[in-house]
Design a protein with these regions (language model features):
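PLP-dependent amino-acid enzyme catalytic core
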Residues: 1-192
């Protein structure tokens, strides 16, 4: 919705539209997180990253793969809005059905000719898709066990990790929790 409004305002000529993902500067900015991760935790086996338009996974994945090529990048997508996940599997931009998702920061399609698809395809080792129920469970785990209140898009990464937790229990796993734009009423209804 915000992206639509931004595009509309840009069409008036008074504003410039900057994509939240389809821009080299945005991708590079997201990549700085990769440098921070490597500085603080240099021996990570797997990194779970929520996927929307692909800016975050492209930026972080590029830095990680360059400096730590054995680290696996696992993209996590909401089943209700999985255009990037489907496009990575297909190898080209494809449109998918979009339904409401708690991971609304990751919702929506990707632009034809997007910069992120070839980058994300190259740096992503695997993709996990999550249901809304799995995202709800991840939000609850973060609130009750970690005392963290994050948006659904951040909890999406944990929901993906939870699917592989047992098989990766002897590895060094990092779940990227990036995003605190939560609707308090929505979170409260999940917790009740």
């Amino acid at each position: 919705m915000a992206e639509k409004k931004a595009r509309f305002l840009a069409e008036t000529g008074e504003f410039e539209y900057i994509s939240p993902y389809n821009d080299y500067d945005i991708i590079a900015g997201q990549g700085t997180i990769g440098f921070e991760l490597l500085e603080q935790l240099p021996n990570i086996d797997n990194i779970y990253i929520s996927m929307g338009g692909g800016g975050l996974i492209s930026g972080i994945g590029s830095v990680i793969k360059y400096h730590s090529p054995t680290t696996k990048i696992i993209g996590v997508s909401a089943i209700n809005s999985g255009a990037l996940a489907a496009s990575i599997k297909l190898g080209s931009v494809c449109e998918t059905a979009h339904f409401d998702t708690l991971a609304d920061g990751c919702a929506g399609g990707i632009d034809e000719g997007t910069l992120t698809l070839p980058i994300a395809t190259e740096v992503t080792d695997s993709v996990i898709e999550c249901t809304e129920e799995q995202i709800v469970e991840a939000i609850k785990i973060l609130v009750w066990n970690e005392n963290l209140m994050v948006e659904g898009s951040a909890a999406l990464a944990l929901a993906g990790f939870m699917q592989e937790k047992q098989s990766k229990k002897h590895e060094r796993n990092l779940v990227l929790l990036c995003g605190g734009n939560f609707d308090k009423n929505k979170i409260l209804s999940i917790l009740n």
